Amino acid sequence: MIEYQNVSLTCQVSGPILKNLTFDIQEGEFFVLIGPSGSGKTTTLKLINRLIEQTDGDIRIQGKRLKDFDLRELRLETGYVLQQIALFPNMTVAENIALIPEMKGLNKEETLKKSRQLLTKVGLEPDSYLDRLPKDLSGGEKQRIGILRAIIANPKVLLMDEPFSALDPISKGQLQDLIKELHEEFKMTTVFVTHDMDEAVKLADRICLMKAGEVVQLGTPDELRNQPANDFVVEFMKNRGGA
């Protein structure tokens, strides 16, 4: 589905940021990028929707080079959920959720119908929430709306950059359960960045552990736990609660 082929990123000022990344993300997979601060995990994710461009190598989606995609089309087909919830403050919940379908020219009545279905699925009563503004929502409710906005138009790829790290433990656990349920239902190829190994182990089909712009180990949670590639993997699993 997504292939990184000898991908590197070098900054003239700070030097190498990513070094010769070569791996694939399978269609329908929940793929987690994890590592310490400065490891390059968020940069690796942002290459997929070309918020950042690599300096060497190729990235392909379903065999097509990213550079050959129309940029607007690529981003409309890629859902994106951030830690800082980017709901438009002057737009209602209904308007926020409908933003991408509207940009894609989808039927408004069908979008509203699907919005109601998705709100119900995530435990938010449509009649109570559709006309609310973001200022009237809790942090967990805002993140639920952000997730719905990202998936309502059936993106090929869902990118999630530490989406739950600012939430309290209860809300965080609830949203982890929710995104796992949505992923299993809609079979979206999901690329998820976190610094929390507990979260990675709970969600991932495979984990890509990075350090200093390189892949240290890529495998299932059990493989990282039971067959660590080196001492760094052992320590990271232990210190981050994954052991």
Specify the residue positions occupied by each region the protein language model found.
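Helix-to-loop junction immediately C-terminal to a conserved catalytic motif
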Residues: N49
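Conserved ABC ATPase signature
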Residues: R132-L137, E141
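Conserved catalytic motifs of ABC-family nucleotide-binding domains
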Residues: N154
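Catalytic Walker B motif of ABC-type/P-loop ATPase nucleotide-binding domains
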Residues: L158-D161
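ABC ATPase "signature
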Residues: L218-G219, Q227
